[in-house]
Design a protein with these regions (language model features):
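Short, basic, helix/turn surface patches
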Residues: 73-77, 153, 157, 228-234, ...
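Long alpha-helical, hydrophobic tracts
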Residues: 141, 158-293
């Protein structure tokens, strides 16, 4: 996986990636082989089932046995723990492309052990994603403990000549201004670097405003390097991936091809190696292997169209956006470090309690939920409510001015209905 991304970085190529999971090993292999050939894939995905993610292996075994008996899928992915190392190895050796496990869990230690031993060379021990999004009650300390284990295991592999790549995107990000997500991504990678992780893929969430999306990616990578260097981690290799809008997708398949195009264009503009796409039929039904292959091939052709071109954004607007976002991220990170007196975990725990790290759409009840985002007139995400974020007046004023401009153009005040419409806009085939 690392070598593949290095090649993409050198050649300025963009590799599509997407989750794909079947209940039985035979179906999983068939799917991967089909997408690799018919979709012209460069990377393949593997989605473990939700029972495996919850460590309920007995229930996963019952589902697997029922599927094998009836021929009907009863799980929403591959039960990797129940199948074990030899089966994962068989799957990996059945295709030429690297297979990327794509899932989140508060405790994925056993799954990741099996996946690594079976030949997978990538995973996503994403501390804040798995804290915010995947459990209502799990503590940050527990998630950090399990993810430190995975990070140390990845470091062990790297020390012995097997480079493994860790991905993180902080939280799903839809409807939330990017600086908060950037801060959590950087904190996640610092915690992993402490355990010896040497290769990371910075995941970015595109909202559709190309200036903000490009700036956010650049700020995220630059500040990650800066804070890693500041803390003594000078040898971490950084790759970049992006996904466009993690909210509801259009039901109409034709509109979803435009979403795939947008994802690929964003990848080109930010210099990403990986484009996290969702299949064109995903909002309508469970995607077939043909749906997945068509999606991959679409992304491949779009990549071919833009690869040789030099595309740049208007510099003055991008510079101002970068200046403001960098200031926001530093405000959050410096407060976390202050809370912990240099200890990231202590600082993060106190920051969550104080609402300095926040998420309005978190499943976890520990979130203050005071921060709210809204789109401005050009589709960039602005802070409607900054909650307890440690922002200066000029930052708050900047966002309020952008929101006021949208209100002026619309002729009405922003309200809760506006927020909901923003979250659903892509599913309707519009940005704002």
């Amino acid at each position: 996986f690392v070598n593949k991304l290095r090649y993409a970085k050198e050649k300025k190529e963009i590799y599509a990636s997407s989750g794909m999971g079947k209940t039985t090993l035979e179906e999983q292999i068939e799917l991967l082989q089909y997408v690799e050939k018919e979709g012209q894939a460069d990377l393949l995905g593997l989605s473990p089932d939700s029972l495996t993610r919850q460590n309920d292996y007995e229930a996963a075994q019952r589902g697997l046995e029922e599927s094998l008996k009836t021929g009907k899928a009863t799980l929403n992915g591959l039960p990797v723990v129940n199948y074990g190392v030899s089966a994962i190895r068989k799957m990996i050796e059945s295709v030429a492309c690297p297979v990327q496990p794509r899932y989140g869990a508060a405790d994925a230690r056993l799954s990741d052990e099996i996946l690594f031993a079976g030949g997978c060379s990538n995973t996503s021990p994403d501390v804040f994603m798995d804290f915010w999004q995947h459990s209502a009650r799990v503590s940050l300390e527990k998630v950090v403990e399990t993810h430190q284990y995975v990070g140390r295991l990845m470091g062990y592999y790297s020390e012995h000549g097997v480079p493994l790549c860790a991905g993180a995107q902080g939280f799903y990000g839809a409807g939330i201004p990017p600086s908060l997500q950037t801060a959590t991504v950087i904190l996640s990678f610092i915690l992993l670097a402490e355990q010896g992780v040497k290769h990371v893929c910075v995941k970015c969430t595109g909202h559709g405003n190309l200036v903000q999306d490009v700036v956010s990616s650049n700020v995220r990578c630059n500040l990650l390097k800066e804070y890693l260097n500041k803390l003594g981690y000078h040898d971490v290799e950084i790759f970049v991936g992006i996904s466009f809008s993690l909210m509801q997708y259009p039901v109409e398949i034709g509109a979803n091809f435009a979403v795939v195009f947008m994802n690929t264009l964003m990848s080109k503009l930010i210099g990403a190696q990986m484009s996290d796409i969702r299949t064109v039929a995903e909002a309508k039904a469970i995607p077939t292997k043909e749906d997945i292959a068509n999606t991959f091939r679409t992304a491949k052709v779009m990549q071919n169209f833009v690869q040789a071109q030099k595309i740049e954004l208007e510099k003055e607007e991008a510079d101002l956006e970068a200046q403001m976002e960098e200031k926001e991220v530093r405000s959050i990170l410096d407060k976390v470090l202050e809370f912990g007196d240099g200890d990231i975990l202590v600082g993060a725990a106190k920051a969550i309690e104080a609402g300095v790290l926040d998420n309005p759409f978190a499943a976890n009840r520990a979130a203050a939920g005071k921060v709210l985002g809204i789109k401005d007139s050009e589709g960039a995400i602005r802070y409607l409510n900054t909650g307890n974020l440690p922002f200066s007046k000029d930052i708050i004023d900047y966002h309020q001015e952008k929101i006021a401009l949208r209100e002026s153009k619309q002729g009405n005040k922003i309200n809760y209905e506006t927020l909901v419409n923003d979250l659903l806009s892509v599913s309707k085939g519009i940005l704002v």
